[in-house]
């Protein structure tokens, strides 16, 4: 029997999960080349989000270089040496726009809010002035959060989907039904993907 391995419609493919990254970052492990923090001091949401996005960018750049190496192998060429690899990695990394990755800060805020509702992260009491407060004094300050005992002991499966953990009555069938109500449209092909005639 042949099983088709095809992703379902909706959602985004990520080299690593948002929940996994948040937990590893707040544990002070510096996941995927991110900065190492003091787990007791914690970090603010804005910084975690920034390091998460940059880590995904690095993973994308690594995948691009890996694809080039695969093409070189197919052509009978040797793979990049360390210096060449680093040059190609820097090349791709410098050309990834910050907003290319689909995760937006609003989505990250919602994700982090679920973690707070579950009691997996807690406010440390430390605050810093946000740059926005320079021209809008009523803006909220930068608040630091750290993992709680419950957050450290929560299993990976729950960290990967805190919304389902928080609202177990909303299972996969609920989200499938919601997706079926949406209208998906195909994006217009880019110039490089359009079929050109042999004469062009």
Indicate residue ranges for each PLM-predicted region.
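Residue-level marker of regulatory loop/turn positions in helix-turn-helix DNA-binding domains and
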Residues: 14, 18, 100, 104, ...
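Short, solvent-exposed secondary-structure capping/transition elements
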Residues: 33-35, 61, 120, 124, ...
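Intrinsically disordered, low-complexity acidic Ser/Thr-rich regulatory segments
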Residues: 77-106
């Amino acid at each position: 029997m042949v099983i088709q391995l095809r992703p379902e419609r909706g959602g985004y493919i990520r080299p690593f999960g948002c929940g996994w990254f948040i937990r590893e970052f707040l544990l002070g492990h510096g996941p995927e080349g991110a900065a190492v923090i003091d787990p007791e001091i914690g970090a603010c949401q804005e910084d975690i989000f920034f390091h998460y996005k940059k880590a995904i960018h690095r993973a994308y750049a690594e995948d691009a270089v890996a694809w080039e190496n695969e093409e070189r192998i197919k052509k009978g060429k040797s793979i990049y040496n360390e210096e060449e690899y680093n040059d190609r990695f820097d090349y791709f990394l410098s050309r990834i726009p910050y907003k290319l990755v689909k995760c937006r800060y609003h989505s990250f805020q919602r994700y982090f809010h679920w973690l707070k509702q579950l009691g997996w992260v807690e406010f440390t009491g430390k605050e810093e002035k946000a740059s926005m407060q320079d021209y809008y004094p009523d803006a909220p300050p930068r608040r630091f959060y750290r993992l709680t005992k419950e957050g450290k002991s929560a299993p990976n499966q729950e960290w990967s989907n805190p919304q389902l953990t928080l609202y177990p009555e909303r299972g996969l069938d609920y989200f499938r039904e919601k997706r079926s109500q949406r209208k998906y449209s195909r994006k217009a092909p880019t110039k490089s993907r359009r079929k050109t005639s042999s004469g062009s």
